[in-house]
């Protein structure tokens, strides 16, 4: 049924974003490109979802409510699901912040700066996670 025989369902992507408008846009873009999106507004909830579910990739805002930010989500993934750490994309409107810059240097994870062009965002996602379909 699939070309490669390795995919039977759309790639599940965990989306961590607390701004409703950005969440809606990113979710719509990912879904229109064939990804199955599981959204959450907080880093703490993201960790609960990661503990109980498998994901093909993660798109995470750097700053999230719930006491757990994007850097902490990445650290958990790197420790517990290292294969997933290579498929995480950060999004942030605070790229000039030194803490954000240090996290990006330390992790090597790609980051798309908000506001972003949809084409630029999905290009980074597909380069990082592969195409969904």
For each feature predicted by the language model, list its residue ranges:
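Charged docking surfaces used in two-component/phosphorelay signaling
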Residues: 24-32
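Conserved acidic carboxylate
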Residues: 17
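Non-catalytic signal-transmission and effector/linker regions of two-component phosphorelay proteins
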Residues: 1-14, 78-79, 83-84, 101-102, ...
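Acidic, metal-coordinating helix/loop segments flanking the phosphotransfer/catalytic sites
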Residues: 14, 27, 39-57, 62-65, ...
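Short amphipathic alpha-helix used as the core "switch/output" element in two-component signaling
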Residues: 48, 69-84
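Hydrophobic/aromatic residues positioned on beta-strands within the core alpha/beta folds
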Residues: 91-92
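Acidic phosphotransfer microenvironment of two-component signaling modules
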Residues: 20, 41-45, 119
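The feature encodes the CheY-like receiver
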Residues: 23, 65-67, 96
């Amino acid at each position: 049924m699939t070309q490669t025989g390795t995919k039977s369902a759309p790639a599940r992507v965990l989306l961590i974003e607390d701004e409703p408008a950005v969440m809606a846009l990113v979710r719509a873009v990912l879904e229109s490109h064939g990804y199955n999106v599981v959204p959450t507004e907080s880093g703490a909830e993201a960790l609960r979802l990661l503990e109980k579910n498998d994901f093909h990739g993660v798109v995470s805002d750097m700053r999230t409510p719930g006491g757990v930010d994007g850097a902490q989500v990445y650290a958990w993934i790197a420790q517990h699901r290292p294969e997933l750490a290579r498929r995480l994309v950060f999004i942030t409107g605070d790229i000039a912040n030194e803490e954000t810059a240090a996290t990006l240097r330390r992790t090597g994870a790609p980051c798309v700066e908000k506001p972003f062009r949809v084409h630029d965002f999905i290009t980074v996602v597909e380069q990082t996670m592969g195409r969904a379909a």
